[in-house]
């Protein structure tokens, strides 16, 4: 966490920054980063941490923000994986959560691909919101369907009515 500082800041926070700890940053449920959570290249993963409904002692429920809400989201996915794969090591479970996380958050938050430090200078190659947003469906489903991402591809319509739009019955060349 960032100690309830309303301004997010570039900082290694302990104990989250220790090598043997999975560090989780809080983001919105849609994947957008609200500007108040800690960001740093030591962050391993992002998880929903805005407007999370939680119990309040003696008062029912309330919505909360922060890594205290995001971390249980990430931990629950690891627990779910443990129930599917009881013989896996902790390292295997963590690797699955990281490799199945969704990096679309960097499309929504492009300024955080290269972490801006507290002075606004980019730290090149430092993905400061981690590997992506935790994704329970992908973490469990990776064994049931291929997980293939094509980042660089192009296709060209080579047959059809000449409108350069792929329509039923048209042919195309796909380059990967």
For the regions a protein language model found, what residue spans apply to each?
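Residue-level marker of structural boundaries
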Residues: 5, 61, 99-103
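A short beta-strand-to-loop transition that corresponds to the Sensor-1 phosphate-sensing loop
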Residues: 1-2, 27
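C-terminal subdomain of the subtilisin-like protease fold in secreted/lumenal serine endopeptidases
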Residues: 20-23, 32-35, 83-162
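Active-site environment of divalent metal-dependent phosphoester hydrolases
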Residues: 2-9
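Residue-level detector of functionally special positions within alpha-helical transmembrane segments
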Residues: 1, 66-68, 130, 135
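Short beta-strand elements of extracellular/lumenal beta-sandwich folds
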Residues: 168-176
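Extracellular S/T/G-rich loop segment that most often corresponds to the catalytic His/Ser-adjacent loop
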Residues: 13-83, 87
């Amino acid at each position: 966490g960032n100690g309830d500082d309303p301004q997010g800041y570039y900082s290694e926070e302990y104990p989250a920054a220790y090598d043997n700890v999975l560090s989780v940053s809080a983001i919105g449920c849609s994947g957008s980063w609200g500007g108040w959570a800690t960001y740093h290249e030591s962050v391993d993963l992002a998880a929903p941490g805005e407007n999370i409904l939680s119990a309040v002692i003696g008062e029912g429920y309330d919505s909360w923000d922060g890594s205290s809400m995001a971390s249980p989201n990430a931990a629950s996915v690891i627990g779910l994986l443990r129930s599917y794969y009881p013989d896996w090591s902790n390292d295997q479970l963590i690797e699955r959560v990281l490799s199945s996380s969704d990096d679309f958050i960097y499309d929504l938050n492009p300024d955080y691909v290269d972490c801006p430090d507290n002075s606004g200078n980019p730290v090149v190659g430092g993905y400061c919101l981690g590997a992506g947003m935790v994704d329970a469906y992908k973490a469990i489903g990776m064994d049931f369907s291929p997980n293939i991402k094509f980042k660089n591809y192009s296709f060209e319509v080579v047959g059809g009515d000449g409108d350069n739009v792929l329509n039923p019955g048209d042919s195309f060349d796909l380059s990967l």
